[in-house]
Amino acid sequence: MLLSDRDIRAAHAEGHISLDPWTDEMVQPASIDVRLDRFFRLFNNHAYTYVDPAENQGELTEQFEVGPDEPWILHPGEFALGSTWEYVKIDETLAARLEGKSSLGRLGILTHSTAGFIDPGFEGHITLELSNVSTLPVKLWPGMKIGQMCFFQLSSPSEHPYGSETTGSHYQGQRGPTPSRSYQNFYRAQITD
């Protein structure tokens, strides 16, 4: 079940959802808007000749910070990691989904590539996978609305929520845009036929 605005407010009041800072005017009919933080990560194209998700490539991205009143310029065809200003926490009874804002989509800005799903039990700043598919550079301002989160009630509480010992939760409690940690649980089936 997708939560409505009144359900989101009630879930927040009951402690099922926490966004810090919480701003009531960010609540939409069936979502809550989230804002862009000041931290970004860009690929360091000179450190490696390729990306391998099975390896720890610690120097693959480099973090940058802009001032609170300075924009980050995302150039055409560029990919950068960003993060939400809000620290998000959801309990084991809910899951969430991050979607882009349609007004930004109409400018060619994609908020995430594939990682829009947020597991029950997650807490931290949400890493954004920002892309500019337009033909012009776009200014991204700290504090601007960058996406919206919608919440889903689970049929029963998660037995092993994100952050529990059994889930291998590599991004729990993350601050700022967190680079890939795919090497920590890399899985590859042996294809024989």
Swiss-Prot record:
- Pfam hit, one: DCD
EC no.? 3.5.4.30
> Can you tell me which family this protein belongs to?
Belongs to the dCTP deaminase family.
Q: Which Gene Ontology BP terms does the record give? A: dUMP biosynthetic process; dUTP biosynthetic process; nucleobase-containing small molecule interconversion
The protein depicted here goes by the name dCTP deaminase, dUMP-forming
Asked whether the keyword Nucleotide-binding is assigned, the reply is yes
| Record HAMAP family | dCTP_deaminase (MF_00146)
Q: Where is the active site?
A: E129 (proton donor/acceptor)
Task: Specify the superkingdom.
Answer: Bacteria
| Pathway as given in its UniProt record | Pyrimidine metabolism; dUMP biosynthesis; dUMP from dCTP: step 1/1
- Origin organism is Bifidobacterium animalis subsp. lactis (strain AD011)
